[in-house]
């Protein structure tokens, strides 16, 4: 079939020569094709996301995956900036309306204030727990390791160790 015979607007996938060779090699490796996957995303530092729509996914016996498809770069920072700009435009459009419909304020400033308020209450609760902690019967090295591994207060580490009868692994798993 030549290019002239393909109808206008038809959805045609052209497979590059290298990809075709790779697919043939995969068939020789006895990888299983996984059906039903509609999208694969890979996240990288800095909110950079690579998305593959309608991928061909293969799984090896060892549990590794091979993904074929066209990767598109999706910058989450740009999406967030666009969403904030749209929300700011919407807020400006509704600036003339001062009456409330019983809804909470969803502006970025209100959300930030709510988050700060919530984090302050958590800090107050943590400070209340921080008082003198009875470490008798527990190894100080165990407590230090749990604090180092889970980044929690010494009081929480002691509490978790006591709950699990001195079992460091279960205490770390609970706090992680």
UniProtKB/Swiss-Prot annotation:
Region called Disordered, residue ranges: 83-110
Name recorded for this polypeptide: Nascent polypeptide-associated complex subunit alpha
Composition skew (Basic and acidic residues), residue ranges: 91-110
Entry annotated with the keyword Signal: no
Biological processes, Gene Ontology terms: cotranslational protein targeting to membrane; protein transport
Highest taxon above the source species: Eukaryota
Function summary: Component of the nascent polypeptide-associated complex (NAC), a dynamic component of the ribosomal exit tunnel, protecting the emerging polypeptides from interaction with other cytoplasmic proteins to ensure appropriate nascent protein targeting. The NAC complex also promotes mitochondrial protein import by enhancing productive ribosome interactions with the outer mitochondrial membrane and blocks the inappropriate interaction of ribosomes translating non-secretory nascent polypeptides with translocation sites in the membrane of the endoplasmic reticulum.
Domain NAC-A/B as annotated: residue spans: 16-80
Disulfide bond positions: none
UBA domain ranges (all copies): 138-175
Subunit note: Part of the nascent polypeptide-associated complex (NAC), consisting of EGD2 and EGD1. NAC associates with ribosomes via EGD1.
Family in the record: Belongs to the NAC-alpha family.
UniProt KW keywords: Cytoplasm, Nucleus, Protein transport, Transport
Main location: cytoplasm
Upper lineage: Eukaryota, Fungi, Dikarya, Ascomycota, Saccharomycotina
GO cellular component, as recorded: nascent polypeptide-associated complex; nucleus
Organism: Scheffersomyces stipitis (strain ATCC 58785 / CBS 6054 / NBRC 10063 / NRRL Y-11545) (Yeast)
Annotated GO MF terms: phosphatidic acid binding; phosphatidylinositol-3,5-bisphosphate binding; phosphatidylinositol-3-phosphate binding; phosphatidylinositol-4-phosphate binding; unfolded protein binding
Cell compartments where the protein resides: Cytoplasm; Nucleus
SUPFAM superfamilies tied to this protein: UBA-like
